Amino acid sequence: LTISVMYFNEHLPISHEIEFWLGCVVALLMGALMGLAKMTLMSTLVIDTSESIMRTEANYISSWFGRVSLAIGAAIGLICSQFLDFRSTILVACAMGLCSIYFVRRAKFPFRAPEDYVSLYSTDRFFLLQGIPLFLLLAMVTMSAGLVVSTVINFEFFCFMFAGFVLSIISEKVVFSDADLKSEPITGLICMLLSLGMLLISQLPIVDKIIPVLFAFGVGIFATRFMLFLIKLSRHCQRGTSQSTYFLAWEFGLASGIALAYGVLNGVKTDIYLVALGLTVFVLLAYNFLLHPWYMSHRNR
């Protein structure tokens, strides 16, 4: 319903200023409602419909759908913008929302008795307070991703990003299955640094195909390991809270990166890539020398 407002927005008899603020309100509502739906699915329903021994695997799979959608959603959006007008693109988005409602209604969720007392405000299943250091570094990495994505208007780039995500899924099961905990985040950050460096200095056509694969590979394995770190940092009955914290870091970072690219850096690609590079270098140093030792001494699982 919120997205459908944009369908009529450009035909309303209102001034450009009111139209701008209406767009801001729609974006705010869309983010809040999408966040509510996704947090409920990831932190409650996915967990409640899984056996206790399979809940980490269920969280792992559901989080990957969120990462892969970064490439698939952007690619579909670019296709729609090339072959359809703006209003038709909005209709496609509404149709996808209806499909989501259909699939959620098809799932069978177990009945749970309500609690005797429900507080008005609570951080339960919202934010894992002991996971703030992980939240901050993950948000910085996804901010780098948001910065890079903001410069892309190429369908091919997102196709190669999807390939990079697939490679990271395979590598987690084959290469990193018995590797040291530190290896995945470090490898992911190094891959991100290499791709950002190539964005800044290389003009070769073949590099344009390597960069999105390498960048998505790095973001994928880093985010996956941090999602598992948050689970292991949580205490009893805080698994859902850890997933909400992960989701909040992922979406906050992406949105902040895109806002920074257009609102502060004015879309200048060189400046955007330099900021993304600086953020990634900072995360690499902070994780290697500060966060990993802290995590090893504070994890609960």
PLM regions with names:
Residues 16-37, 206-223:
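Hydrophobic core of transmembrane alpha-helices in multi-pass small-molecule transporters
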Residues 26-64:
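Cytoplasmic helix-loop-helix junction between adjacent transmembrane helices
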Residues 36-50, 220-235:
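Intracellular juxtamembrane helix-capping segments at the cytosolic ends
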Residues 54-78, 247-259:
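Glycine-rich segments within core transmembrane alpha-helices of 12-TM secondary carriers
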Residues 87-106, 271-294:
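Symmetry-related core transmembrane helices of the 12-TM Major Facilitator Superfamily/SLC fold
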Residues 156-184, 188-192:
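Transmembrane alpha-helices of Major Facilitator/SLC transporters
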Residues 182-226:
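C-terminal transmembrane helical hairpin of 12-TM major facilitator-type secondary transporters
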Residues 234-269:
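A late C-terminal transmembrane helix in Major Facilitator Superfamily
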